[in-house]
Design a protein with these regions (language model features):
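Glutamate identity and glutamate-enriched acidic tracts
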Residues: 5, 21-25, 47, 59, ...
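Intrinsic disorder/low-complexity signal
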Residues: 4, 24-25, 52, 67, ...
Length: 101
């Protein structure tokens, strides 16, 4: 998947609200949001397709946002890491959790 595809698809798969880094910084500056945990990392379970990887990645993001007591997240980085000799990959996601009005 391309970066645009990931950025367009991931927010549709999460229950938590997706914020761009710029939106997050503006909301913090205007006291509308606060960071709960920065630089959280989640490794999605191995699946058969990138779409399924993204679906389980979204589920992991939502679980961390809920556990942290938030309602929003900021996608910082993601990558598919090759984990076996057959070319199997796992999705690694870096994100911040936030609490917003």
């Amino acid at each position: 998947m391309t970066p645009i595809e990931v950025n367009n698809k991931l927010p549709t798969l999460t229950k938590s609200k997706y914020l761009t880094q710029l939106q997050a910084e503006d909301n913090v500056k205007n006291n509308k949001c606060k960071y709960l945990v920065k630089n959280r990392n989640y490794v999605a379970p191995m699946e058969l397709s990138t779409k399924d990887d993204l679906k389980y990645g979204a589920k992991g993001i939502d679980e961390w946002v809920k556990l942290d007591g938030g309602n929003d997240y900021v996608l910082k980085n993601y990558k598919w890491v090759t984990v076996d000799y057959n070319g199997g990959t796992q999705l690694h996601i870096d994100f911040d959790t936030m609490l917003c009005e």
